[in-house]
Amino acid sequence: MQECRINPKALLGQCPQAKALLQGSAKYPDIKGKVMFYQTEYGVMVAAEVMGLPFRMNQCDRPVFGFHIHEGECCLGNAEDTFAEAGQHYNPEEYPHPYHAGDLPPLFGNSGYALQVFLTERFCVREIVGRTMIIHSMPDDFTSQPSGNAGEKIACGVIKSCCNC
């Protein structure tokens, strides 16, 4: 049997190279979360933990949320779009959707809570510092152009470099 190359448990015990603290919009004030970014030799390990997500009791209607890195540098907005200045999906290579560097796996809500860890080669940590993390109200369909029809932006956080955690 081949030995595992990345030890997520060991990485999660270390200080990440960057992190974003997520806060819900005025309509979703209970959403709070943290996304941590760890650079590895195989790509970036992303660890996300989010609380206060909207949920319904119907077992067949469990929410799935679009989860992206956006190109903007702040979470300001207006009456129509709470986080308008977060901009579009981070897409430095101008690839079609769903191949944007900022297209990430969706968050699966569990009674208002989501936890996920994944590895991606779409970016390096240094490339995304200063960008924004967005949670959308609906899942990304990974088809619609330009950004997957993921609905309203319900939470946002700026990705910041971590020197001292």
Q: What name fits each language-model region?
A:
Residues M1-C165:
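N-terminal leader/targeting pre-sequences
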